[in-house]
């Protein structure tokens, strides 16, 4: 068996196209332009590239992009004052604070200063709690992207056994909550789970988000299972730096029914879902129906 390759890059392009259509409808029908504000503190090169990509794609779908690039020495009071202004700015429907923040800033304090309705990363404690209790919330972008791809590939997920390897607040825990919301039977595993391979082999859906390069090999995979690889790891191989996931693609693809590659799998969905969340936040703020299929 050779697994179907789930093309996250193509799927993300489809999500962005759908968002662009809905943005155009908002402009034509209601005179509303969704706005996304991104806040970057410091000069971290990877964060600068990521913020630039977010701004570019925001504009491409017809939204307003507001970038706030602050020096690394910005005080907590200054950052919180900016967030307060953005919270009260009617042109801004989504706010994202690029992480990680410099060490002198309290990330939890900053994230929880956001208006939960504008927290398009879904990290505010209110959104975390609402997701956990099955209420309408802003859903973290990476798990939302995984769910979209699973729905597209498998259709109804009800009754399937799902194993999420990883328990982070950003991916593992919200992914498990989303799968519970789809009526899956969910197991959260991690690096200390006893006989992890046996646990994973019981999964119809296997989500790897443990942060260990190529940890999940083919003998962890149930024949025909759908494998979603959230990991992004840089390793040295043959004198070159290579990007790999948490799944050993070559061996897992021989067993799985479908699998996401790294790169080109889950990664492109993160920004696409950020745009989808901004659209959702805009619709909610204006009392308009939310577009179907772009949120949980």
UniProtKB/Swiss-Prot annotation:
Keywords: Amino-acid biosynthesis, Histidine biosynthesis, Hydrolase, Methionine biosynthesis, Multifunctional enzyme, NADP, One-carbon metabolism, Oxidoreductase, Purine biosynthesis. GO terms for molecular function: methenyltetrahydrofolate cyclohydrolase activity; methylenetetrahydrofolate dehydrogenase (NADP+) activity. Gene3D superfamilies: Leucine Dehydrogenase, chain A, domain 1, NAD(P)-binding Rossmann-like Domain. PROSITE patterns: THF_DHG_CYH_1 (PS00766), THF_DHG_CYH_2 (PS00767). The keyword Oxidoreductase applies. Signal peptide: none annotated. Catalyzes the oxidation of 5,10-methylenetetrahydrofolate to 5,10-methenyltetrahydrofolate and then the hydrolysis of 5,10-methenyltetrahydrofolate to 10-formyltetrahydrofolate. This is Bifunctional protein FolD. The gene is folD.
């Amino acid at each position: 068996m050779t697994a179907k390759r789930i093309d996250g890059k193509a799927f993300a392009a489809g999500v962005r196209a759908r968002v662009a259509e809905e943005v155009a409808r908002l402009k034509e029908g209601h005179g509303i332009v969704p706005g996304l504000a991104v806040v970057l503190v410091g000069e971290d090169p990877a964060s600068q590239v990521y913020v630039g990509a977010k701004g570019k794609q925001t504009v491409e779908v017809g939204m307003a992009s507001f970038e706030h690039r602050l020096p690394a020495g910005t005080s907590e009071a200054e950052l919180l004052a900016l967030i307060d202004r953005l919270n009260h700015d009617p042109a801004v429907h989504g706010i994202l604070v690029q992480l990680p923040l410099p060490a002198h800033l309290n990330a939890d304090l900053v994230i929880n200063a956001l208006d939960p309705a504008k927290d398009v990363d879904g990290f505010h404690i209110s959104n975390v709690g609402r997701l956990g209790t099955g209420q309408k919330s802003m859903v973290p972008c990476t798990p939302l992207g995984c769910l979209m791809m699973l729905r597209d590939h498998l259709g109804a997920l009800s009754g399937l056994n799902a194993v999420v390897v990883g328990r982070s607040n950003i991916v593992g825990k919200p992914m498990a909550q989303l799968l519970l919301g789809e009526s899956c039977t969910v197991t959260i595993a991690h690096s200390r789970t006893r006989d992890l391979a046996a646990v994973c082999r019981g999964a119809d859906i296997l989500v790897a988000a443990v942060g260990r390069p190529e940890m999940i090999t083919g003998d962890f995979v149930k024949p025909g299972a759908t494998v979603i690889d959230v990991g992004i790891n840089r390793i040295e191989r043959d004198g070159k730096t290579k990007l790999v996931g948490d799944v050993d693609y070559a061996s897992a693809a021989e067993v799985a029914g479908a699998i996401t590659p790294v790169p080109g799998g889950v990664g492109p969905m993160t920004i696409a879902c950020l745009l989808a969340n901004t659209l959702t936040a805009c619709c909610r703020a204006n009392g308009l129906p939310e577009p179907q299929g772009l949120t949980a």
